[in-house]
Amino acid sequence: MKINIRYAKLEDAVAMVAIKNRLSFKNINGTTTTGGFLLGTTLQTYQEYIANDYCLVAENEYQIIGFGIILKNTTLQQSDIWTKRHAANWEIDITKYESPNVCYFEQLAFLRGYTRVVIRLCYQLLQLAFNTHDNLFTTTVSSPILNLAAIPFIEKAGGRKIGSINEVYPEVGLILSDIYLIEKHIYIKRLEQSGLQPLLNRIPYELQIF
């Protein structure tokens, strides 16, 4: 098995939508929901992410098996996420983090059976993001579905839960999400402890083969 991790191209957006639509999530009542992220993402949205933000894809024999997206500060500040930050239930003083050096982990989606690849792609994404950003925020949905895909990596990278937010969307109703923060200086310490730093420094981002 030959796995490549590379920058996403505009033409990859079609495969990304297909992966999103194959994802399944466990509802808190024990049932399973299929069809991708709760609120969905359009082909055009993925193309915009690819053009403007940090977006990596993983391939197995040239077939895309997963992807990750981090929004740069410019995109974040123009998003609904940024507008809604004052509606969140914070466990920290959020004003200390409202700076140009904040980015946001938007999506992580993989087909089943590629756990190790997920972690490696996430490390690559954070390496890119922390070249120009000091703090990374992300949210994970806790109700009405459980989206736990990113939590193992968040914990490995030194992330911590720092709040929650309740949102109401006409198409789905009430959504509850936990908010996490990964700070660059803590991430660097965790990376050094993991022993992966030399590997990430040595291999170009354009192509990761393992």
Regions found by a protein language model. Give the residues of each.
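Conserved GNAT-fold acetyl-CoA-binding loop/helix
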Residues: S24-Q44
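Conserved GNAT acetyl-CoA-binding A-motif
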Residues: C103-F105, A129-P144
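A short helix-loop-beta-strand connector motif used in the catalytic cores of GNAT acetyltransferases and
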Residues: Q44-V57, N73-D80
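A short beta-loop-alpha structural element at the N-terminal edge
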Residues: I3-A18
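Conserved acyl-donor/pantetheine-binding loop and adjacent beta-alpha core of acyl/acetyltransferases
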Residues: I69-Q107, G113
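Conserved catalytic-core motifs of GNAT/GCN5-like acyltransferases
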Residues: T140-S142, R160-L174
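Conserved beta-strand-loop-alpha-helix junction that forms the acyl-donor binding cleft
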Residues: L108-R112, T138-I151
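Conserved acetyl-CoA-binding loop-helix of GNAT-fold acetyltransferases
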Residues: Q107-F130
